Curated annotation (Swiss-Prot):
Enzyme class: transferase
Swiss-Prot/TrEMBL keywords: Methyltransferase, S-adenosyl-L-methionine, Transferase, tRNA processing
GO molecular function: tRNA methyltransferase activity
Reaction it catalyzes: 7-[(3S)-3-amino-3-carboxypropyl]wyosine(37) in tRNA(Phe) + S-adenosyl-L-methionine = 7-[(3S)-(3-amino-3-methoxycarbonyl)propyl]wyosine(37) in tRNA(Phe) + S-adenosyl-L-homocysteine; 7-[(3S)-(3-amino-3-methoxycarbonyl)propyl]wyosine(37) in tRNA(Phe) + S-adenosyl-L-methionine + CO2 = wybutosine(37) in tRNA(Phe) + S-adenosyl-L-homocysteine + 2 H(+)
Residue numbers binding S-adenosyl-L-methionine: R59, G89, D114, D161, L162, E188
Feature: compositional bias, Basic and acidic residues: 1-10
Associated pathway: tRNA modification; wybutosine-tRNA(Phe) biosynthesis
InterPro entries according to UniProt: Kelch-typ_b-propeller, Ppm1/Ppm2/Tcmp, SAM-dependent_MTases_sf
Organism for this UniProt entry: Homo sapiens (Human)
EC numbers on record: 2.1.1.290, 2.3.1.231
UniProt name for this protein: tRNA wybutosine-synthesizing protein 4
Region (Disordered): 1-21
Length: 686
């Protein structure tokens, strides 16, 4: 890489600091953390989305956890030396000011290193802000050619390139850093921006230079799955590519990396584990109630793709003080794959409107016509709640073709709902239940979609009108992320609506029965233990009842239970399905029953370092097995959450429609085309 290319890339990395600083300011402004200094250090303001807030919150709490563990250990009465904090790539972070205000720097000092331009700008900002100068005390500013940009009794800011370690060591020594003193080295999203050889040299240099130290690292991992690929693509487009992820893709590889570089002990956890194990339940509830939130999939994916690591040298700094082992977050890794389901793109769909949306619903209108409605996606060149309906149809040549239609007439129009359910009542009628317009606005009313074909019976000329169903004052369903399943009791057909969430309740445990013939809500006795509340679960019709699998529970942790609402003489009975081996907890998946087997497709899980494929459960024996999805012939990342799926039992295929989400700060991703899964190996293995 030439000098000019290095300079351009360094500039791009510095730009990530500016964006991060604004996110931290927004985080504090919304009350996630107490940090009055973020607004003083960062000019301007930006209101970030709730998902960004949560991501930066867990990052801030993880770093705070490590810093406090270090200071509490070094601050013990027997400690003789002053503690040192060396923040690498510190940017405009306010750590020094927060520690100074909290009285935690009585026997400690802070050094910060960043690119010269960033360091000078921060030093200037501090110097012109009286509130900050009052905390630093008397200070000096370095000469323009000097690495030292700011110096007070317990705070130094240096402008240095971390790739030039000899100069870094000399400048730190001149600024008073004592390598023999207990030292916390902090690198938040820093090492991954360095070329692999530079990052390796920095880790080894720190191990050799500081005999009594703790090295805390926060950065990205898991580049292999669809979210990881999209994350890598985002940073490449910013001209700040992430390095080293292929060689060190997970926490185990990162542990080995530091141990082999000379660190004596190392512990690391991903951010899902940190959030659930190292934050008190009361604090989690506080954060979860700060502002409306409904992007659980991307929140858990973001946390699965970042880790916090603490590597130590010396007897007084043990990594177990930072991340003690916990049984509160057991790892539940799936069994070794029993087979593979090949995936392929529906080829003929590429020349027609694509189904680029998520949070929608899909249903068969007829054996050769699939309707998808609602969700968030692309429409007329912008991202929005989609109002057009998508049809996937095929002729006698068995090639699927897509088309889009809008509602006709001047009556009821599609209201833009998502996370609703759709049930086919006939070839010309579809029932729409629940959904939301936003996390604080449920979609009101039950809708019926009525379809009319043209005189030549051309599916592409299908017309749709929308009517309100049920009573105008019916407020039974103000929920979303629920399920609707066709069940039967005493020769009567019902729709069983279960779970979900609402504006008032973050997770629901209740259910309702809708009589199909009269479109009236009825009460039917249900016996057995009431299941744990959940949303984003799956539900399938089976033997007149409903199979409920997985979901997200009240603690925002995925569930692994499979339940059967079994018909009995007087109504229904809840039963638990015993599964061996137990399945990995998951949610936001889809499910189907094929030849006495329950298929759980895709979804989100947080208790395993792998990513979900298809779990197959034999409903007779209770035995479960795992199948990988081979995406060799899918030329783009395939995200299997917020999607829908349609089973083609005769062809032994599964159609995967839509899916994706708002992927943290990396942008919104939609699966661009419909994908087919070949399930024939499942029948071959019978």
């Amino acid at each position: 890489m030439g000098p000019r290319s290095r300079e351009r890339r360094a500039g791009a990395v510095q730009n990530t600091n500016d964006s991060s600083a604004l996110s931290k300011r927004s985080l504090a402004a919304r009350g996630y953390v107490q940090d009055p200094f973020a607004a003083l250090l960062v000019p301007g303001a930006a209101r970030r989305a709730p998902l960004i807030h949560r991501g930066y919150y867990v990052r801030a709490r993880a770093v705070r956890h490590c810093v406090r563990a270090f200071l509490e250990q070094i601050g013990a009465p027997q400690a003789a030396l002053r503690a040192q904090i060396l923040s690498l790539g510190a940017g405009f972070d306010s750590l020094y000011f927060r520690l100074k205000t909290a009285g935690r720097l009585a026997r400690a000092a802070v050094w910060e290193v960043d690119f010269p331009d960033v360091a000078r700008r921060k030093a200037e900002r501090i110097g012109e802000t009286p509130e900050l100068c009052a905390l630093t005390g008397p200070f000096e500013r370095g000469e323009p050619a000097s690495a030292l940009c700011f110096e007070s009794a317990d705070y130094c800011i240096l402008g240095l390139d971390l790739r030039q370690l000899q100069r870094v060591e000399e400048a730190l020594g001149a600024a008073g850093l004592d390598a023999a003193s207990p030292t916390l080295l902090l690198a938040e999203a820093v090492l991954t921006y360095l070329e692999p050889e530079s990052a390796a040299a920095l880790i080894a240099w720190a191990a050799q230079r500081f005999p009594n130290a703790l090295f805390v690292v926060y950065e990205q991992m898991r580049p292999q799955d669809a979210f990881g690929q999209f994350m890598l693509q985002h940073f490449r487009q910013l001209n700040s590519p992430l390095h080293g992820l292929e060689r060190f893709p997970d926490v185990e590889a990162q542990r080995r990396r530091f141990l082999q570089a000379g660190w004596t002990a190392c512990g690391a956890v991903d951010m899902n584990e940190f959030y659930h194990c190292f934050l008190p339940a009361e604090e989690r509830r506080r954060v979860e109630n700060i502002e409306p939130f409904d992007e659980f999939e991307e929140w858990h994916l973001k946390c699965a793709h970042y880790f916090i690591l603490a590597a130590s040298r010396g007897d007084t700094l043990s990594h177990t003080l930072v991340f003690p082992s916990s049984e509160a977050f057991p790892r539940v890794n799936p069994a070794s794959p029993s087979g593979v389901f090949p995936a392929s793109v529906v080829s003929s769909e590429g020349q027609v409107p694509n189904l680029k949306r998520y949070g929608h619903a899909s249903v068969f209108l007829s054996p050769d016509v699939i309707l998808s409605a609602g969700g968030f996606g692309e429409q007329e060149g912008r991202h929005c709640r989609v109002s057009q309906f998508h049809l996937l149809s095929r002729d006698c040549d068995s090639e699927w073709k897509g088309s889009q239609i809008g509602s006709c007439g001047t009556g009821v129009q599609w209201d833009g709902r998502l996370y609703h359910t759709m049930t086919r009542l006939s070839e010309s009628r579809v029932l729409v239940l629940g959904g939301r317009l936003s996390p604080v606005s449920p979609a009101l009313g039950v809708l019926q979609l009525h379809f009319f074909k043209s005189e030549d019976n051309n599916t592409e000329d299908l017309k749709v009108t929308i009517t309100k169903a049920g009573r105008k004052d019916d407020s039974t369903l103000c929920c979303w992320r629920h399920s609707t399943t066709e069940v039967s009791c005493q020769n009567q057909e019902y729709l069983f609506v279960y779970g979900g969430r609402s504006v008032v309740e973050p997770v629901l445990s209740d259910w309702h029965f809708l009589h199909v013939g009269t479109m009236a809500w009825v009460r039917i006795p249900v016996e057995g233990e009431v299941p744990e509340a959940r949303h984003s679960h799956s539900a399938c019709t089976w033997q007149g009842g409903a199979l409920i699998a997985g979901g997200l529970g009240a603690s925002e942790e995925p569930l692994n239970s499979v339940l059967f609402l079994r018909p009995i003489s007087c109504g229904f009975l809840w039963e638990s399905v015993d599964i061996q081996p137990p399945i990995t907890p998951r949610y936001s998946h889809t499910a189907h029953v094929l030849n006495g087997k329950l298929l759980l497709v895709g979804g989100i899980w947080i208790h395993s370092s792998s990513f979900p494929g298809v779990t197959v459960i034999n409903l007779t024996t209770g035995l479960s097995s795992e199948y990988q999805i081979d995406t060799t012939y899918v030329p783009w990342p395939l995200m299997l959450h917020n999607h829908t799926s349609i089973l083609l039992p005769e062809e032994q295929q599964l159609l995967l429609l839509g899916g994706g989400g708002n992927c943290f700060s990396f942008g919104t991703y939609f699966n661009p085309h419909t994908v087919t899964l070949d399930l024939s190996s499942l029948s071959a293995g019978q």
